[in-house]
Amino acid sequence: MEHHSDIDVREQPDEVQEYNKLLTENWDFPLIITTNVQFFESLFSNRVARCRKLHNICNSVVVFDEAQMFPPELLNPMLQMLQSLNYSFRTELLLCTATLPIFDKDLSNKNRDGQNFFCFEEPIEEVVPYDAELFAAFDKVTYHWSPLKLSTDELAEHLLQNDSFLCIVNSRKDAARIYASLKERYKGDDLIHLSRRMCALHIQNRLKEIKERLRSGQSVKVISTQLVEAGVDLDFPVVYRAMAGLDSIMQAAGRCNREGRMPVPGKVYIFRLTEERNANGELGLAQGSLEDMVDQLVRSGTPQQADIEHYYRSFYSKVRNFDAKGVAKLLWGDEDDQKERIRSLRFDYEKASDQFKYIEDHTKQIVVPYGKEGKELIEKIQRNIPLRRNDYRLLHRLSVGIYEKDYLTLGKSILSDGDGILYLTDEQYYSNDIGIDIANMNSELLIVSDGREQ
């Protein structure tokens, strides 16, 4: 059973949808495919509907894909919860990642009272022990670690020296700007933009187009945000990655010569845009940690286990708080009062549930007129035609998140149905090339705050 927001149930009859809804509440199924958001927010919830599934996690095996993406500011409560599942509920945990964080290493620092890293008490066992000679077979790319320092236009010229490429940047604003620069210089139909300026259905269709071009040997030039770095099976001869953390660089490299069919290694370039401001938050910490070890990586070539551990030690030493919302303290308390909390069952589940948000979303979701489905759905909303369950499911796939300032900028182009559904009425502000587009109103649509695409 699949339990996540991208499920397309439009072809399912109502009775099947109702049955599946019950299954998603209790996870009474032998195999569940879900997301970190669903999993962890259920574990930390105090609401009956979300907690109803927890007993089925006992005596199970939980597989986490891309475990390096656990948010640092929530690591303490998340790791403590996972250890509790393992110790008390006999749940086996399998962490899948090319860059395993040091979740089992003690990073205590006496000068950081109350902000220390919680590590697993038992060491993580490697399913496949590291063997340099064995793993050499997976060295499919050559890393160019010394960052290229280029303006947007210089980067565009650099990219167009390749028939096919994937360029990954840190923000939607950068993606749109580089795409515009490429469009000025290149008029081919194989140039594709990907970002969360586009609704999920739009992204899905673009990915299908990219995969078909790659499969048939046609050229394809892609400028994208980080959305292609995990769970997207693409294979390019050359990849450019804006400066980020080592984990992100290696994720991007996984989209280069992925299937190992090239007679020579693929090429991975790292670059910094000269117009780019110093990043804040998680992205800034990650960039700083990578820059500190560029010389070491140049010597290594392909990152080794020691390089990955060095990176995470550096990165985690810069993180200010691994329990930024105080969730772990609400549930487990300090060492001094932990036993008393357990004896008296004094746990503040309600506040912990309110504070634990796997993804902080400060955007407004706007339904956009993408394709026939988007236009028809907006027409239904405008004509006050009652929406069916399938329509509500489709709302998610046709929505884009925008920030308050951009919501205000779009002004009268966004209307509400009165029940909380916002929709874009002016089609000129949704482009088939880049999605939401308000460049004509002289407004930058999005900003970078913590390294996650926004």
Predicted regions and their residues:
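Inter-Walker segment of RecA-like/P-loop motor cores
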Residues: 1-44
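Conserved helicase motor
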Residues: 2-16, 170-173, 191-208, 223-229
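Conserved two-lobed SF2 helicase motor
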Residues: 26-46, 213-229, 241
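SF2 helicase catalytic motif II
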Residues: 37-40, 50-85
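SF2 helicase motor core recognition
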Residues: 42, 220-236, 251-259
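Conserved interdomain hinge at the start of the Helicase C-terminal
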Residues: 77, 83-84, 138-173, 177
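C-terminal helicase lobe and adjacent C-terminal extensions/tails of nucleic-acid helicase motors
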Residues: 86, 153, 160-162, 173, ...
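Interdomain hinge/linker at the junction between the two RecA-like core domains of SF2 helicases
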Residues: 99-160
